[in-house]
């Protein structure tokens, strides 16, 4: 039997099908990398605003160096997808706690974005250098501003107390600089270093300083966080209210003595050791040592409110969601 004509028909049919498939696929994905077996996705660059208000001060971003520095940080937020999205989700839990404390101490609300870039809104964050908690205090600085830091208790991981300590640090820096942008830069670069460089370089604006890369980027990262939080959808982050992390309801139990076994104590409180540690990450061991007779307040999750339910999560900021 002569199979040649049938083979041609089959091959022609396959070629036609492939052409149609490719045309459809090509219309959806604009560019294909020839010979690599990969496709290029449609990326875009977030828009750099001409200016922005930070702590009540208008910052001009049209000068080429500022524009390009700002562009770099916006791109980083846009394409570090998982980190940026998770930071927004966590902010729904922690911004409502942090904002009133900032207000109480007279700290501009924009400093919550400093916290966001320091820890990605995670109270468990720890750097390679040993900085810990939402505000990334080193041990020495934490103790200097009133936090108890030892192997048993580390209040750098305490959401409220570490925020109070951060406010005290920021206020002390403002008393020195009388400029919130300088204060923000000093949080990363150190108060003495920023003041010394401003004198040495004969500049009045912190953003005009020539600094090591990490510190030079720092204020721009804070501003980029503010821009992202003001409109996540512009970065491609289309979140629903149900995507955000809930605020876990809890009751408080005051303790003035030590606790030899936190797991057994948690069970008596109607919870688990894991959940106790989740709400009280400043407890660094499986017991509470309290030789000095201090007073501690422990958070115990309320069982009835621990579960996610459809339509039960309220966005702290409506701009974060697309619904």
Regions found by a protein language model. Give the residues of each.
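An acidic, Gly/Ser/Thr/Pro-rich helix-cap/linker signature
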Residues: 3-106
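Second-shell loop/turn segments in exported
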Residues: 77-88, 98-101, 121-128, 132, ...
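Short, functionally critical alpha-helical segments immediately adjacent to catalytic or ligand/cofactor-binding
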Residues: 107-124, 183-190, 276-279
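Substrate-binding/active-site groove segments that recognize
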Residues: 129-150, 163-165, 170, 194-197
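Catalytic and binding regions of secreted/periplasmic enzymes and modules that target cell-wall glycans
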Residues: 170-197
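Primarily a LysM-type cell-wall glycan-binding module
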Residues: 240-270, 322-323
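LysM (lysin motif) carbohydrate-binding repeats in extracellular/periplasmic proteins that recognize
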Residues: 261-290
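Extracellular LysM carbohydrate-binding repeats and other cell-envelope/extracellular binding modules
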Residues: 279-317
């Amino acid at each position: 039997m002569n199979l040649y004509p049938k083979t041609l028909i089959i091959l022609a049919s396959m070629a036609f099908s492939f052409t149609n498939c490719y045309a459809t696929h090509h219309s959806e994905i604009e560019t294909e990398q020839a010979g690599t077996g990969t496709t290029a996705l449609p990326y875009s660059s977030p828009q750099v605003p001409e200016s922005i208000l930070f702590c009540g001060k208008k910052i001009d971003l049209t000068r080429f160096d500022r524009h390009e520095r700002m562009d770099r940080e916006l791109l980083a937020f846009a394409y570090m997808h998982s980190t940026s999205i998770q930071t927004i989700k966590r902010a729904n839990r922690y911004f409502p706690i942090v904002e009133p404390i900032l207000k109480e101490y007279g700290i501009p609300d924009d400093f919550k974005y400093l916290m966001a870039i320091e820890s990605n809104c995670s109270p468990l964050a720890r750097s390679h250098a040993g900085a810990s908690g939402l505000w990334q205090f080193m041990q020495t600085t934490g103790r200097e501003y009133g936090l108890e830091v030892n192997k048993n208790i580390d209040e750098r991981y305490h959401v409220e107390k570490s925020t109070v300590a951060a406010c005290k640090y920021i206020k002390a820096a403002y008393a020195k600089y009388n400029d919130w942008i300088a204060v923000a830069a000093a949080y990363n670069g150190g108060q003495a270093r920023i003041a010394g460089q401003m004198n040495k370089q004969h500049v009045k604006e912190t953003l005009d300083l020539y600094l090591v890369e990490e510190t030079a980027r720092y204020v721009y990262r804070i501003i980029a966080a503010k821009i992202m939080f003001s409109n996540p959808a512009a970065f491609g982050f289309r979140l629903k209210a149900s995507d955000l992390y809930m605020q876990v309801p809890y009751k408080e139990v005051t303790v003035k003595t030590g606790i030899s076994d936190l797991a057994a104590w948690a069970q008596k409180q109607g919870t688990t050791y894991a959940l106790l540690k989740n709400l009280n990450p400043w407890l660094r061991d499986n017991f509470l040592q309290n030789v000095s007779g201090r007073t501690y307040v422990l958070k115990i999750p309320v069982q009835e409110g621990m579960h996610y339910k459809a339509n039960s999560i309220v966005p702290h900021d409506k701009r974060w969601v697309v619904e």
